[in-house]
Amino acid sequence: MVDNYHSSLDVAKTPIQSDADAQKSEAETEGPSSKSSQIAAGESIADSVRNFLELRQGGIPDDTGVVFDKISAVGSGTGSQDAPTVTSAAQSAFGLLSPLQNRQRKQYSRPILSGFSGTINPGEMLLVLGKPGSGCTTFLKTLSGLWDEYKEIQGELTLGGHPLLDVMKQRPQDILFCAESDDHFPTLTVAETLRFATRARCGPQVSAREIDTMVTQLAKLVGLGNVLNTKVGDAKIRGVSGGERRRVSLAEALATCARLICLDNPTHGLDSSTAVEFMEMMREWTTQSRCVAAMSVYQASDAIVSYFDKVLIINSGRQIYYGPVRDAKAYFEDLGFECLSTTTVADFLNVMSADPDVRRAQENRENQVPRTAEEFERAFSASPIYQEMQKSVQVAKERFQTNPSPLVKTSAFALPIWHQIWYCAGRQFRIVTSDYSLWAVELATIVVQSLVLGTLFRNQQRTTSSLFIFASALFYSVLVPALQSMAEFGNGFAQRPLILKQKRYQISRPIAYALGLVTTDVVWKVAAICYNIPLYFLTGFQRTAGNFFTWFLIIYLEHLALSMFFRSVAIFSPNMHRAVLPVGIFFNMYVLYTGLYVPAPQMQVWLGWLRYLNPLYYAFESVMVNEFRDLSYQCSASDPVPSGLGYNDMAHQVCAVVGSEPGDRLLSGASYIHAQYGFKTSHLWRNVGINAALFVFFALCSGIGMEMLKTPAGQLATVFYKSSPGVTHRRDKIDSETGQDQGNESSEMSAGQSNDALRLQEHQGPDKSHNLAWTNLCLDIKTKEGDQRLLNNLSGSVKSGQLKALMGVSGAGKTTLLNALAGRSTIGNLTGTLALNGQVLPTFFRSRMGYVQQQDIHLPTQTVREALQMTARLRRPESISVADKNAYVEKVIEWLSMEHIADALVGVPGAGLNLEQRKKVSIGVEMASKPEILFLDEPTSGLDGQSAMLIARLLRRLADSGQAILCTIHQPAAELIDQFDKLYLLSRGGNLVYDGSLGTRCHEAIQYFQPRSRPCGPEENPAEYFLAVIGAGSRNDAHMDWASLWNDSEQGKEREKAEESLVPAAEQAPQLEQQSLYSVPFHVQLWVVVQRTWLYYWREPDYVNSKLWMSVGNSLLNSLTHLQSPNTERGAYNRVFSAFMSLIVGPPLGLQVQPRFVTLRDIFVHRERESLTYHWLAFVLSAFIVELPFTFLSSLVYWLLWYFPVGYFNAPSRAGYSFLMYELFGVFATSLAQLCASLMPNIEAAFAANGFFFMFCNTFAGTLSPKPVTPSGWRWFYNISPLFYLGEGVTVDVLQDLPIRCEESEVSIFYAVNGTTCGQYAQDFLKTATGYLLNPASTTECQYCRYRDGQSYFQQYGYEFAHRHRNIGVFICFIAFNFTMVLVMTYLTKTRRH
């Protein structure tokens, strides 16, 4: 039950109009609508809304009104700044050291909204209009109380008579802001998504059956009834269509039943009919629930506008109109503006927010109309409408002051926190089980690792020679979970926007999501038993239930504690690049201070305390105690000193193992681990408790960190510009909301088109005329239900100088057709004929086709000019000089009015160009190639009406210059569709229903449909009419077979004959002259792509800084731990394992490399590969080449801070060898990381695979599992383990010729036979021994040092100094193999047939 406030404000209602509706603009996954998906027969929208509200609320709620008076919003920053580079980052770092410079740092701010006032009465809908960047989103966020994103909010804002801040504190669930982006868990179904939101907002008292009823009813309201059991999906996971995904977002928002609903561009991705249908439903929703709704809508038709009560028009952050919708047009006409008969009221109002030259003044009033935002604001302030609005504000304030309604505090969340955690955990279980790719990789890797390690250490005997093997096996048992936990650290970054959204919706607290993940982990980590069982029993650990389950509990808690720790680090990091640095350093520290490499007694005083922060240390001590405490170990035949013939009396021998007593053949396990590692048997359960406590602590930290998540205000809406000598930027005009430079864009693209004509008069179009024709095009895919046809015998053509619109209802296959024509179809079986100028279309011609995708896919660090220049250099013929190509790019920039952003980085949404600018860049990239044929997939999607019109006029002018263009569109205004020559209209199932001329005001196409259906109304949008009559919309009842009508019509038959004449018979088809698949030679491709990739690295200093600082941190950790290792047995051990620890940094290095490789790969796969921009080999080579300098630099930094402090040899030949090998190791780590990234489907799986392969290589490096004691079945693996050659080379290099002098604690003591000296007694033994006697003249106590020098020490690992130089070549071969496999896997998985 929802409590509400009271308001006596009147409701101004707009008559509800019904219109034909449609589903989304592109829905390859949609099938025909079923009866269950639609509103029940005979049930009106009003009845459906009423039924849901009664289910959800138990009745009609009371009223709530909004009053805002002189509200202003101030944002942080200037809105634009120079792009950071490695150089600028270094300068900034040095600048921070200057106290004076720090004091001079200034906090910049910028106004976004200025002095807005108005009221929204209960049951009213407010339409917010404005050009992108004018402040529409900021206004909605301000109404919604999302003030954290801004530096300051000023003015008075009340809801139900109460200050908004009080409402946010007392009843935040009554306010909702639905963003334009669609953030969902992609592997959940639509029903699961809506059920979670509905359950969370209804509370625990509502039964599951009632929840299901609500979900069904809500899905019907937004037309999702037929896809309830379909995955939501995203850009990578196939699910519902984009329009349906948008409706899922809207349904989720409505499920909250908020009192104030703010929707940011809710019709984005919806076709015109579906958009009207949604607004009709919202009109009923607000009227019946008496809630308040405010929406920004781009490309709003008159039908959509008619549902609103009031409209707010914003121009550059200033309020230029607020009042009734019905009075808005007359108001601006009174100011002197003219609304043409062909212009919709929505476009006329929207253009008031645009630039001066776009607006049309009445004759003889050109100099009297307002031009700037300030002039508009002054004109509105002087108008009667403004005075009436101010009066209504004051009246509302007085009414609330005299008759205030109570503000009853209720819980913001309908579900108690424990219920939220429970439902979040259940949802996470569903996500884990439905997204099998990641957990399948994880499970496979741990099972394989377990089998490898178990068989490698199998059936160890209880002898002293197995002590180190047991310790190594136990170390691996705690290391593998650590690697797995580290690989999972980045899993939550993609969900951050979703978590913030659900917090905003009061669906669930972020801490509930975090603890739900913890609950899932507690159960899912039990799957680690798949790892534990083989390793434990194959190795030969104590086979008792008590020991096994104790061991399992220890590993289990360690895994949980580490997972929570790395997740906490990631949560408190702003992004993945920043998180990699602490994760890599902490991982290295945890492994180093586990207690094996550096036992506690040998830890340096200044760093030994780190072990107390280390879950691995507690786990390793516990598993060692669990295994060793109750056992004794027989002294092995090789361990007694002296040994051999004549040495059979143990009374005069000692087992040369730490912890042994002279004359005793048995070694107590407890004594050994205490003497060697400093472990105490009493610590077993203490450590279990500590790790359990660390798990709880880090879990709470992750929850607290998740609860603290918010969008940082200082990083919003910033445009970065290229910074270089001679480059100046025009930043005189900044978008009030996004902070983006507008320059004189609109003055250069005016509605009068005079400037447009001048700009394009030099555009000659393609060099030749072309006619692309297709006949009998069919596309069939296999589904669970059988074969499904997406395209059904389609025929058509597009000619030079022709602008053809491709439209269709839901599931028509518009994008599928474009992909098929452009040679980009990747699914199903495509049949039919494609011909160019009467000849079979060759593959190489694809590089001459331009394809503007619906998604704007660009490298964020490229400038607009660089993006266009790259395309021109790679896709235009080599015969054209680079200078001419660049000159043509400048013309394209001018044609698209992008001069002011030519040197701006494309960036990402929210930190880069806005949607309109990004769309222009996408078009410009394709125009820069001077294509013969241009395809565009919904280029106006998400743009406001005026921006869409500018794009349409641009296409019109391109067509007039001779360009052949086929363009899909949705939500087209009547004026916009009038720019097109032809219409290619599809119905569901990929059937053609019309292919012909549109005519003036679409007269010809209307004449075809009207005799066969209803007439088109005089004010009706022709585009909406076409979709309506052929059956668009979730409630449309049209059942006519329009495809058959077209095929049987005279126009259809004539068109078919004309198109068949353009396509030759297969046996007679002439071939175009064969040309190279790519426009320029490979070396040119490689050079251009390398330049682009270099700038990608150079302009993201976070990556380089992270790489260098990780090298600094890990090298200092290693060197300070082993600082100036002495020439003792322990010192030799330290030297070996210090070298080995330098290899443990491999997995963290992979965490840095892989995301960048995947980013470059995705851009290549989704855009550049399809257009044959460059060969796939150029992508792989460039990614590897550009990594090398940064890899070499970071390896150099690591080596300098590690090698000399440890105390290794200073001789150039020795130091140089280690330096070379470590540089090669950096290259190897990079190549292995890129190999895993090329092999795996996503970055999370790549992280897991990288850890697995490094684990495998480290296992056979020869230090933890020495080759001489390895079972023969595994010994050959050392020959294929790259780290064995590296470990051998570096180890022998740092130990050869090193004299070893044992300390007192390292000496083995035995007693000489009476009458002999120690030297005499042991002389036969010493002839073959690796050590020496310290006191050969003694006749009693003999002191034996096990190792004489470094070479005698490293022989135990099977290393040989003679292999030193050979290993360089072998290691280089492994690097070459890795890189070759990167090429092979990229070719097999990402290139298809190219």
Swiss-Prot record:
Biological processes per GO annotation: patulin biosynthetic process
Biased composition, class Polar residues, residue ranges: 737-755
Impact when changing H1122Y: In strain: MD-8
GO MF, any single term: ABC-type transporter activity
Applied biotechnology: Patulin was originally used as an antibiotic and specifically trialed to be used against the common cold, but it is no longer used for that purpose since it has been shown to induce immunological, neurological and gastrointestinal effects. Genotoxic effects of patulin with dose-dependent increase in DNA strand breaks in brain, liver and kidneys have been detected in mice. However, more recently, it has been proposed that patulin might also have anti-tumor properties.
Transmembrane segments annotated in the record for this chain: 437-457, 467-487, 511-531, 546-566, 579-599, 688-708, 1131-1151, 1177-1197, 1219-1239, 1245-1265, 1280-1300, 1368-1388
Principal subcellular localization: membrane
Stretches for region Disordered: 1-41, 727-755
Superkingdom in the source lineage: Eukaryota
Binding site for ATP: G808, V809, S810, G811, A812, G813, K814, T815
Induction comment from the UniProt entry of this chain: Expression is correlated with the production of patulin. Expression is positively regulated by the secondary metabolism regulator laeA. Expression is strongly decreased with increased sucrose concentrations. This decrease is lost in the presence of malic acid. Expression is increased with pH changes from 2.5 to 3.5 in the presence of a limiting concentration of sucrose, 50 mM. Natural phenols present in apple fruits such as chlorogenic acid or the flavonoid epicatechin modulate patulin biosynthesis.
Pathway: Mycotoxin biosynthesis; patulin biosynthesis
Sorted UniProt keywords: ATP-binding, Cell membrane, Membrane, Nucleotide-binding, Repeat, Transmembrane, Transmembrane helix, Transport, Vacuole
CDD domains listed in its UniProt record: ABCG_PDR_domain1, ABCG_PDR_domain2
Membrane topology per record: Multi-pass membrane protein
Membrane keyword on record: yes
Protein location: Vacuole membrane; Cell membrane
Outcome of gene disruption: Strongly reduces the production of patulin and leads to the production of a distinct dark-red pigment.
GO cellular component: plasma membrane; vacuolar membrane
ABC transporter domain mapped to chain residues: 98-341, 767-1013
Function per UniProt: ABC transporter; part of the gene cluster that mediates the biosynthesis of patulin, an acetate-derived tetraketide mycotoxin produced by several fungal species that shows antimicrobial properties against several bacteria. May be involved in the secretion of E-ascladiol to be converted to patulin by the secreted patulin synthase patE.
Family recorded in the similarity comment: Belongs to the ABC transporter superfamily. ABCG family. PDR (TC 3.A.1.205) subfamily.
Protein name: ABC transporter patM
Organism the protein comes from: Penicillium expansum
Lineage of source species: Eukaryota, Fungi, Dikarya, Ascomycota, Pezizomycotina
Gene (name only): patM
